[in-house]
Amino acid sequence: MSQKWGLVHIYASYNNTILHVTDVTGAETIAKVSGGMIVRNQRDESSPYAAMQAAFKIAELMRDKGIDQVHVKVRAAGGQKSKNPGPGAQAAIRALSRAGIKIGRIEDATPIPHDGTTPKRKNR
């Protein structure tokens, strides 16, 4: 049986967690699920529970398309915002592996500024 690879982009901020599955080139979207699609309350969108449920849902959609192995790209807000991924990133990766999806590489794709715009000043 041939193994089909996919690419899971996990955008984890402190407001939401978005999981987006593409083919290996990143050109064709296969499935997309966010924490806001899972929970009812807006405050729970970024929670590890919402990320876990989104990962289980996306694993099911991937299996329907025949993808059983993935590489993972984790991304935080970055730029002038937080460079640390939100609480849902680790939970989503753990849930993907629990759902039976084999994980290849895990890569950080957070954008880092190379001296672009001036950050907001701190309050005194």
From Swiss-Prot:
GO BP terms in the entry: translation
Alphabetized Pfam families for the sequence: Ribosomal_S11 (PF00411)
Keyword RNA-binding: yes
TM region(s), chain numbering: none
GO cellular component: ribonucleoprotein complex; ribosome
InterPro entries according to UniProt: Ribosomal_uS11 (IPR001971), Ribosomal_uS11_archaeal (IPR019961), Ribosomal_uS11_CS (IPR018102), Ribosomal_uS11_sf (IPR036967)
Disulfide-bond pairs as recorded: none
Highest taxon above the source species: Archaea
Keyword match Ribonucleoprotein: yes
Assigned protein family: Belongs to the universal ribosomal protein uS11 family.
Primary role: Located on the platform of the 30S subunit.
NCBIfam families linked to this entry: arch_S11P, PRK09607.1
Protein name: Small ribosomal subunit protein uS11
